[in-house]
Amino acid sequence: MKTTLLRLSRRAACLVLAGGLLTSCSLLPAASPRHEGTASSQAPQYYSDAWLSDDSLHYVYSYAGNGGGTILRGGRVLYKASSSDSIQLLKDTLTGETGHYLVAHSTPGTEERTSTLYDADGNAVMTFPYAVSATLSGGLLILNDAADVWAFENGTTGGTRVYDLATGVQLPVPETALDCLVVDEDGQRLIFNCYDLPEGLTYAYDDPDQPLHQYVLITDREGNVLLREDGCTASTLASYRGGFADWLDLSWFRGADWGIAREALYNVTTGELLTGEEDSAVSACGVGVACLQSRQDSRSVLYDLNSGEAVELGRFDWCVMDYTPGCVTLLGSDDPDNPYTLIDLASGEKTAVQRSDTDYHSGNVAVLTANNVLKIYDGTTGALLTDVEVTPVEEGHYVSLTALPDGYALLQYNSENYDTVAIQTYSGDGLLWSSAGEAQQYTYASYLTNTANGPLLTAHRDNSDSSNLSDVLDMEGNLLLRRLGSCYSIDDLPDDCFIARQGFDYGLMDSTGQWLYRESIFSSPSDDAGGGYLY
């Protein structure tokens, strides 16, 4: 029999009716006009709306770095924050969609803060009379009071609230909840990490057995308890493409020392429980693929969790680092000089590997074998994209490997003193560029963005004036742009788009040097303090 042990949260949020979303609330003004904030129509414009046409939400941090920033939809400004605003762009942890953003505002003349949730059109959807942090999972909005972030330290719980974003309905939450997780895409199961403060105690830090008084509750939307696990905590699994649908990582505490006795994979929809080897630990190894590894001897079991039930893919002597269809990379080797092993799952062939890396944009897995062969596997199909010999640099004492989209890779060689002696790029055709022998070396290079002609790199060298400036290179080492400040990429930007600063402007730029969106560094309300940077 199901038991209902829940109550609605102690605070009632004022919810804004947006197109019939909610039924009891007051209407808010347009999204942008806030104290010190700038409406989109008032924002200084140095660009064309058509230049950034992906129609997605993007957050450009304030140049000053402390509060502020700009929310874009494509190239259109939805919200330009004041220095006292803080913005959180909400990406659904399961679907990967980014359709909302949350702004915390200061109340003029007071130390109080309020929060407003906006949709992708800049319309206010919900408002709260206090600061909150938010997570969006499976269409459910999970809120925690900013003031309750450390509430667990004094035994206070119950600062978590959950709303169905489609209807605005607030769902029941346990009084003892510390947080909430959602792993099924329909949002039918709610997972709560909870803590019971023992009777007679006022503060959690006075509890000598805190871990043993934590527990996991799984409920339905009505608050009916479907599962309780004592002395346990729950966490989600995630790959470069987002969360694992329906699966949780459950960890049971060993005792009061917070040590973990064992972990297991649990399917909240089917109830399937995978325990693996004794004293196991859980790790994600690919899209919907996870490993259960023994803490005693590193033996591991690999599971495909993409279908309704788990499918065992293999058992191995070491922990699985990365999986692509057809092969795995293990953290361990019979060769003391090479820390990794590549195994072909069809033939069972083992290859010693000196370096391994996964490109989190594409999921491609790159390995540099002990005999200096570079292999790159497609993260989705497992197809071998690149299989070429690498030309080692004689002066190189250390080598690092970076996997890039479309079968490309970046190698960097360092001396015994960790000075860069060469940067190399490779594709399926072999070596594209090597900086070995150049009079002045870049100190490092990293992935910037992808284009129709292949990835681009941002490369930095120490300048005599101590300036922190970067160049933009293609994979053949050609210089496309030079001496840019704050040149880097953030998640979910379209191809051929990155963040840069040039002179007194910063924003989004493409590889031709064309601004897709830009602001003056002096447009930030905090610039009079001097300095600052763009994240």
Task: Label each residue range with its predicted role.
Residues 2-13:
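Bacterial N-terminal signal peptides that target proteins for export
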Residues 27:
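Short, conserved catalytic or interaction motifs in soluble domains
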Residues 23-24:
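C-terminal motif of bacterial Sec signal peptides marking the signal peptidase cleavage site
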Residues 33-535:
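Residue-level detector of conserved, function-critical positions
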